[in-house]
């Protein structure tokens, strides 16, 4: 086979790949599932609100396209204040977001929680919408390894 023919076969193969992928997606029902991991590590109400708005906006766009979205907001370090029942500046917004995006999950870092409890000398209450995870950074790694896209507002 001469070089031109090899080149033509390679080019045709590369051009066909997107069409094969579309056919496969259509055969699976055409719904694409999206996964989003949002990282909050600052005690800043604006950053926290941005994380919630990112979640709301992504959900609206994917829902309008008929596509699914899984979201987990992981909070550690000073960002844990987002999920503290006693200090969260966005507790009401989280409650409201759960009504429109019920699939959103919130991960509260136990390492940070334990350090805050030691420093403050009292238990740190976490909002009921959140789940305590062993380590926030490890949770973010696990989510990325599971195919989640990482966003840090």
Label every model-predicted segment.
Residues 20-36, 43:
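C-terminal segment of N-terminal export signals and the immediately downstream linker at the start
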Residues 84-153:
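A cross-taxonomic marker for long C-terminal extensions/tails that follow the last structured domain
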Residues 5-24:
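N-terminal export signals
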Residues 69-83, 112:
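Acidic helix-start/capping segments at beta-turn-to-alpha-helix junctions
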